[in-house]
Amino acid sequence: MNIHEHQAKQILKKYGANVPEGVFAFNVSDLLQKTKELKTDKYVLKAQIHAGGRGKAGGVKIVDNLENLEKEANILLGKNLITHQTGPLGREVKRLYVEEVSNISKEFYLSCLVDRVSSKIAFISSDQGGMNIEEVAQNTPEKILTTKVDFNQEISEADCKKIIRVFELDDNSGSEAISLIKAIYKLFIENDANLVEINPLILTKENKVVCLDAKMTFDENALFKHPEIQELRDYNEEEATEIEASKHDLAYIKLDGSIGCMVNGAGLAMATMDIIKLYGEEPANFLDVGGGASKEKVSAAFKIILSDKNVKGILINIFGGIMRCDVLAQGVVDAAKEIKIEVPLVVRLAGTNFEEGKKILENSGLKIISANDLSDAAKKVVEAIK
């Protein structure tokens, strides 16, 4: 689950990190009123959307008085902001954030995330922070330092020093940076975060280490433990279909292709998408039905897939382990009859009771194309939509 910058900064502040003073609002009138509380005559106006690249897209403005702030806020609020992370449709700006301008001396990059390969927490640091960090990673990867640390109650002083050594700070600012690393580690563990990113982390001309921007994501499977984090969720920033899928315990991510996928298991879902691409088409979604497939769940999955007007065919790929293929097949048949699917439907079943499942599909009277294996399924669904 993603949250907005202003929310992430409040969490950082709670853990003792330095962040610029700021205010947010959903309308310009409230924003101007709240901005008067800030002790500055120069402001940074920021669009609040769940996407990076706002600065290059015109979503960050520096203004020197309230009159200009009002003018820029009226332009930005309601604007469809298109960045390299939003896709061509962009994201509508529905909330704005204003903070005090910082006197920047140096810009750094700092992030903390789960490294699933090593099963450790990885801190990534660089002295090349700012809007061009992606280019730095691509063109000069030696400028980026990765430090992997074990899951513990606290991070060691030695690991903190490794992480910040690329910043080349003096003793005072170095001590602040170490305190920040400890704070980030603590909030990361305590809140089941997947990512904490500070870009840029800055050293001010007053020699203070300040989080100038902040991004956080949290493990959705752990949100039941953190109602205060759950309350920060902004459904306006999420795909309506993904919200609907979560109500039915379906893992769904919308993509840009033409073949809808319904699969059990994330690994099998990834393999299914790969083989669709191998046969020359693109998957329209990632959809994992998990370990159960009642008529209601399959019906919900079909409706979500078919709500995407780009879908020209559907591939169901099920390996029966915990899930019985005959139960899944009956759910598919019942749901297909109820919804009246008008695009080609290819089903591949393997595992527990797969023969019984195939018979249910064959005797359904529906135009369901049966496949023997994953390659056969991908080939048939690609041919069917031509």
What are these regions (language model features)?
Residues L110, R324-A335:
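Short Gly/Thr/Asp-enriched flexible loops that form oxyanion-binding sites at enzyme active sites
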Residues I318-M323:
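Glycine-rich, proline-tolerant flexible connector loops at the mouths of alpha/beta enzymes
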Residues E342-G351:
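Short internal beta-strands
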